Swiss-Prot record:
Cofactor(s) this protein cannot do without: Mg(2+)
Disulfide-linked positions: none
Pathway: Cofactor biosynthesis; thiamine diphosphate biosynthesis; 4-methyl-5-(2-phosphoethyl)-thiazole from 5-(2-hydroxyethyl)-4-methylthiazole: step 1/1
Biological-process GO terms, alphabetical: thiamine biosynthetic process; thiamine diphosphate biosynthetic process
Enzyme Commission (EC) number: 2.7.1.50
Catalytic activities: 5-(2-hydroxyethyl)-4-methylthiazole + ATP = 4-methyl-5-(2-phosphooxyethyl)-thiazole + ADP + H(+)
Pfam families membership: HK (PF02110)
Coiled-coil blocks: none
Annotated protein name in UniProt: Hydroxyethylthiazole kinase
Biological role: Catalyzes the phosphorylation of the hydroxyl group of 4-methyl-5-beta-hydroxyethylthiazole (THZ).
């Protein structure tokens, strides 16, 4: 099935709801991107909470609006905390999102992520290599880097979405968002987004937060991808390189006006 182009008008409408709700988003993410992830959510209007201790993570997941599990710096003790939080979220019907960082390259995290799939994530966000590996169609990748184009992983993403009954996001130059039956494409962004650490991980947090919104999950998640792409483009226009890109990106998210961006493109 061919992907449809995501509607920016819908993304603008969704952003208004997102800012009004300010989803409390429980981020169990990797050590490298904690600050950037929290600042990304804050800039868009969400409320991040970086609760990782096993004693606290389980009860907090039940009161949050959304949960993110990112396995980038996975350890055995952190895996236990994440599993407890996911079980709590599942019982409380809190939507949770999986970011299977480098899942095709390392066996421990691959087995951990596969085990978590039985607890029905609302969304999965990864690059092409990660989605191919999680679906069982291929292993590999270079850590957080992909060795495949996003479009090459689309059949795997669609199959995984049908298998788990969730939204799957494959990110790249064009992002693809699918529920297994319908697929949306989101072009845009800028190559500078790949020259700093954390844009993909931060997107996963925004995806997680968007899953707390009412309405169609496919459209909400695609809107989250659209916001990040638009902010990346705007930030790149005002940046001289990676160092100046990061603050410009956060400013672009804070001032994001999808309707205005739509009118100028």
């Amino acid at each position: 099935m061919q992907p449809d182009l995501h509607c920016r008008t819908l993304a603008a409408h969704t952003l208004k709801h997102f800012r009004a709700l300010s989803p409390l988003t429980h981020c169990m993410t990797n050590d490298v991107v904690q600050t950037f992830t929290a600042n990304t959510l804050l800039a868009l209007g969400a409320s991040p909470a970086m609760v990782i201790d096993p004693v606290e993570a389980r009860p907090f997941a039940a009161i949050a609006n959304a949960l993110l599990v990112n396995v980038g710096t996975l350890t055995a003790s952190r895996a236990d905390a994440m599993r407890g939080a996911v079980e709590s979220a599942y019982d409380a019907k809190t939507p949770w999102t999986l970011d299977p960082v480098a899942v095709g390259a390392l066996e421990f995290r691959r087995r951990f992520c596969l085990d978590l799939l039985s607890l029905r994530p609302a969304a999965i966000r990864g690059n092409a290599s990660e989605i191919l590996a999680l679906s069982g169609m291929a292993l590999g990748g270079r850590g957080v880097d992909t060795t495949e184009a996003a479009l090459a992983a689309l059949p795997a993403a669609q199959a995984l979405a049908r298998q788990i009954d969730c939204i799957v996001v494959v990110t790249g130059e064009v992002d693809y968002v699918t529920n297994g039956q319908r697929t949306l494409s989101i072009p845009g962004g800028d190559p500078l987004m790949t020259r700093i650490v954390g844009t993909g991980c931060a997107l996963s947090a925004v995806v997680a937060a968007s899953c707390a919104l009412p309405g169609a999950a496919l459209d909400n998640v695609a809107s989250a991808c659209c916001w990040m792409k638009l902010a990346g483009q705007a930030a790149a226009e005002r940046s001289e390189g990676p160092g100046s890109f990061i603050p410009a990106f956060l400013d672009a998210l804070y001032h994001l006006d999808v309707e205005a961006a739509n009118a100028t493109n």
